[in-house]
Amino acid sequence: MESTIVMMMMITRSFFCFLGFLCLLCSSVHGLLSPKGVNFEVQALMDIKASLHDPHGVLDNWDRDAVDPCSWTMVTCSSENFVIGLGTPSQNLSGTLSPSITNLTNLRIVLLQNNNIKGKIPAEIGRLTRLETLDLSDNFFHGEIPFSVGYLQSLQYLRLNNNSLSGVFPLSLSNMTQLAFLDLSYNNLSGPVPRFAAKTFSIVGNPLICPTGTEPDCNGTTLIPMSMNLNQTGVPLYAGGSRNHKMAIAVGSSVGTVSLIFIAVGLFLWWRQRHNQNTFFDVKDGNHHEEVSLGNLRRFGFRELQIATNNFSSKNLLGKGGYGNVYKGILGDSTVVAVKRLKDGGALGGEIQFQTEVEMISLAVHRNLLRLYGFCITQTEKLLVYPYMSNGSVASRMKAKPVLDWSIRKRIAIGAARGLVYLHEQCDPKIIHRDVKAANILLDDYCEAVVGDFGLAKLLDHQDSHVTTAVRGTVGHIAPEYLSTGQSSEKTDVFGFGILLLELVTGQRAFEFGKAANQKGVMLDWVKKIHQEKKLELLVDKELLKKKSYDEIELDEMVRVALLCTQYLPGHRPKMSEVVRMLEGDGLAEKWEASQRSDSVSKCSNRINELMSSSDRYSDLTDDSSLLVQAMELSGPR
C-alpha cells in the first residue's frame, strides 16, 4: 500500500513536471512567432530600454518602429541579421534588467558590467541556450542567483561579481561543463561551495560561505561531488515491496558511508592547510601536482614550464620587455599559455612576499585586463603564466597586414582605457601600470584590448597618493614628473595612455611621430601645431590615409583626448574614467575648452623639451628599450 502511494505521488509529480515543460515550450515558441509587422527582437530590445534609465542617451537610436535593430548602438548581429550581442558596459545605466531579454534567443554575448542596474537577475535567463558570455559584474543586482543559470550549457564566461547577490550557490552551476571562467566574488552568498567545472573561478569576498560544507554553522545544501546524480524529487525511488525497502536502506547506508569518507578527507585537508606555513594549499589535478589559492590561481612546477616552452627555446620567444622575456608554452592538457620569465628572479624578494603580491594581483579581474593564470617560484626563478593571446600586441598588429581599421583602433583605445579605470579606481588596493604603451596592450580573439604587463606594478597604499621608486618605463611614454622626481601616480598612466592614442592615430612608435615629416623639437608641440592648423592628414597613419578609411571627426576627437592626457602638469590631466567618457563622446568639448584657457602648457614647453625630446640623450634607445633610472631620494614633500 505504501509503495503504491509513493508510486502515485511520483506519477503525479511527473505529470506536473511534464505540464511545466509544455508551458515552457509554448512560451518559447510564442517568442519565436510574430504577428505581421512585429519584430520580436525589436520588441525585446525596447522592453530592455524601457526598464533602464539611460542618462547619457547611448540607447537613443533604439526605435520601436524600426524593422531591423542591427544598426543600433550597443547591438551586434550575425550575418543572418539575428541579434547575437548586447553590450552596454560602463554607461552609468540604472533601473532593472527586463525578463524580455530572453526573447533574444540567439544571444551569445551579454555585457552589462560597470553600471548601476539593480533588481533580481531574471529567472528566465536560463532560456538563452546559445549564450557564451554573460557579464553582469559591478552592478547592484540582489536576490539569489537563478537556478536556471545552470541550464546555459554553452556558457563559457560568467561574471556576477561585485553585486549584492545572496542565498546559497546553486548546485546547477556544477553542471556547466563548458564554463571556463566564473567570478562570483564580493557578494553575500552563503552555504557550501559546489565543485565548479570552470578552470578559473573566484569566490572571495563572500564571508558566509562554507569552504568544505562540514562546518557546524553551515546552512544550505551539502557539498556533493560532480559525479553523484540525484533524482529531481529528492526522495528515494521505491519499486514496491520490502525487498526494495531493504535495497533503499542498503543504498542509504552506502551513501552515508561515502559521505563520512568525504567528511574525513575534508577534515584531513583542512588540518594539513592549517599546519602548512605556505599561503597556498596543495591539490591534485590529473597527472600533475599544482598549488592553488582561493580563486584557483595555479602554482606550476618549474620543470612543467620548461617542458611547455621547450626549455625556453628562442623559437618560442614572443617578446622581450623591461620585466623579462615572454615565451609561448603548451601545457600537458594542450592549453596554450604565455610564460613571463622575470629578470633577476632570485632577487625579487622572498617566497611568501612574492606569493602574497601575486595573489593580490590575481584579484584584478576585468575583461580588459590580462588575467594571471598562475605562477612558479624557485630559489633562482620567478615566472608568471598568462593566457596566450593569438593576435599579439597592438604594436605588432600596427605593423602587420592587413592594417587595423579605424573602428578597431577606436575600440582598442576604449577597451584599454576601461582596463586602466579598473586598475586605478576599482581595484583594491589600486595599481599603477607605469608602462602604458602599444606593446603592452594585447588583443584577444575578438580584437578586444587587454592590458598586460601590470603584474609587477607597484600597489598604491590607501594613505599615499604617490609611490617613489626606480623609474621604469619606455622612453617616449614616461611622464615628465615621473622621470624627474621618481613620483608616479594614476596621472603617470594617463600620460602614457595619451601617447598610446597617438600611436593608434599615426601607426608609429612614440619616437617616430615627427621623423617622417623631418620634424625636430618637442614631439607633443608638433602634434599640437598640426591640430591647430587642422592638418591632421599629416598625422594619420598613411595606410588609413590611402584608403580614406577613417572618420575625420573621431580622429580629431582622439587627438584632442591625447593632448589632454599629455598635459605637462599632472593635475591638469583627466582621470581615466573621464578619458573613457570623452572617447565615447561625453564631456570632451568642455574639457578641451577649459584646457585652452589655461596657459600652463605653453609655459612649460621648454621644460618638456629638456626632459623628453633630446635626440642626443636618447639616441641609443628605441621604443622597445626600457629606461631604468634610480629615483632621487626625496627628503620630504615638495
Curated annotation (Swiss-Prot):
Residues 32-248 are extracellular. Inhibited by the viral nuclear shuttle protein (NSP) that binds to the region required for oligomerization. The modification Phosphoserine is found at S393, S396, S484, S489. The active site is at D435 (proton acceptor). Residues 422-502 are annotated as: Interaction with geminivirus NSP protein. It is found in: Cell membrane. Changing T468A: Impaired autophosphorylation. This is Protein NSP-INTERACTING KINASE 1. It comes from Arabidopsis thaliana.
